[in-house]
C-alpha cells in the first residue's frame, strides 16, 4: 500500500531556509519596568527571525524558549510571530530554543542553545568594546549577540515542499543594508578576517619555532 501523501518524501532533494537567532540587551538605568525584581539590571529580548525581517510563520509553527529556572514559568511558548520574548535580568545563562515546524511538515523539532549575552566584549589588545558584525541600527548602549544559520530540510514531504516553495525564503542579498547585514558581502569579510588571522598565527608560530630551535641549539 502506498504511503499517504503527507508522509511521501521527495527523494534526493533538500530545501534550506535562513534564520537569525540571538538576543539584544541594554542596561535599564532608571527606566525599570514595574514588575521587574529590584536586583535586575538589564532588559533583554531573545528571538528567532528571518534575516530580512520576512514572515517565517508559514513554515514555523511555534518557538519554545526555556529560561533559567529562577524565572517564573521558565518555559515560554511563542505560537505567533514575532517569535521573541522580552525579560529583565542580571546574569547571563544558556537559553534552550526549540523550533516546531508546520503540521504538514512531518519534521522533528529543532533543538539548540543560545548563550544570553548582557555585557559587551572587550578586545584584550585594544581594550575597546567590540561591536557585533550585525551593526544594523544598534544603539551604542545596546549589546547584540546574533547568529546566522540555515535550516536544511532533507527530502521534505510533498505538502511541506509545496508550502516552502510558496514563498522565496532562501534569497541571500549580495550587499549589506541598514536592515539586513547578513549577506555575501559579510560572508566575504568574515573569510578575509579568517585569512588575516591565519597568516598572523602562522607568522607567530614561525617566530616561536625559531626561538625554540635557538634555545635547543645555541650554535644554530
Curated annotation (Swiss-Prot):
**Keyword DNA damage listed:** yes
Question: Where, if anywhere, are coiled coils annotated?
Answer: none
One annotated GO biological process: chromatin organization
Where is it localised? Cytoplasm; Nucleus
Q: Which cysteines are joined by disulfide bonds?
A: none
Q: What keywords sit in the KW lines?
A: Activator, Chromatin regulator, Cytoplasm, DNA damage, DNA repair, Nucleus, Transcription, Transcription regulation
What is the predominant subcellular site recorded for this chain?
cytoplasm
Residue ranges annotated for the YEATS domain, each copy included: 9-167
Q: Record's GO cellular component, any one?
A: cytoplasm
**What job does the chain carry out?**
Component of the SWR1 complex which mediates the ATP-dependent exchange of histone H2A for the H2A variant HZT1 leading to transcriptional regulation of selected genes by chromatin remodeling. Component of the NuA4 histone acetyltransferase complex which is involved in transcriptional activation of selected genes principally by acetylation of nucleosomal histones H4 and H2A. The NuA4 complex is also involved in DNA repair. Yaf9 may also be required for viability in conditions in which the structural integrity of the spindle is compromised.
- Record text on subunit structure and interactions: Component of the SWR1 chromatin-remodeling complex and of the NuA4 histone acetyltransferase complex.
**What family is this?**
Belongs to the YAF9 family.
- Name of the protein in question: Protein AF-9 homolog
Gene for this chain: YAF9
Amino acid at each position: 500500500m502506498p504511503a499517504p501523501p503527507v508522509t511521501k518524501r521527495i527523494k534526493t532533494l533538500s530545501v534550506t531556509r535562513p534564520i537569525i537567532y540571538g538576543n539584544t540587551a541594554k542596561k535599564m538605568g532608571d527606566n525599570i519596568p514595574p514588575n521587574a525584581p529590584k536586583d535586575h539590571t538589564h532588559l533583554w529580548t531573545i528571538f528567532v527571525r528571518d534575516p530580512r525581517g520576512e514572515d517565517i510563520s508559514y513554515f514555523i509553527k511555534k518557538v519554545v524558549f526555556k529560561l533559567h529556572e529562577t524565572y517564573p514559568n521558565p518555559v515560554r511558548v511563542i505560537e505567533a510571530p514575532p517569535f521573541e520574548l522580552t525579560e529583565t535580568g542580571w546574569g547571563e545563562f544558556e537559553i534552550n530554543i526549540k523550533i516546531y515546524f508546520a503540521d504538514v511538515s512531518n519534521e522533528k523539532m529543532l533543538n539548540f542553545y543560545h548563550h544570553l549575552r548582557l555585557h559587551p566584549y572587550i578586545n584584550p589588545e585594544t581594550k575597546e568594546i567590540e561591536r557585533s558584525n550585525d551593526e544594523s541600527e544598534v544603539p551604542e548602549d545596546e549589546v547584540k549577540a546574533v547568529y546566522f544559520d540555515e535550516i536544511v530540510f532533507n527530502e521534505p514531504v510533498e505538502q511541506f515542499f509545496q508550502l516552502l516553495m510558496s514563498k522565496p525564503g532562501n534569497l541571500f542579498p549580495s550587499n549589506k543594508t541598514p536592515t539586513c547585514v547578513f549577506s555575501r558581502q559579510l560572508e566575504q569579510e568574515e573569510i578575509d578576517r579568517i585569512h588575516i588571522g591565519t597568516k598572523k598565527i602562522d607568522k607567530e608560530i614561525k617566530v616561536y619555532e625559531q626561538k625554540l630551535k635557538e634555545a635547543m641549539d645555541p650554535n644554530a
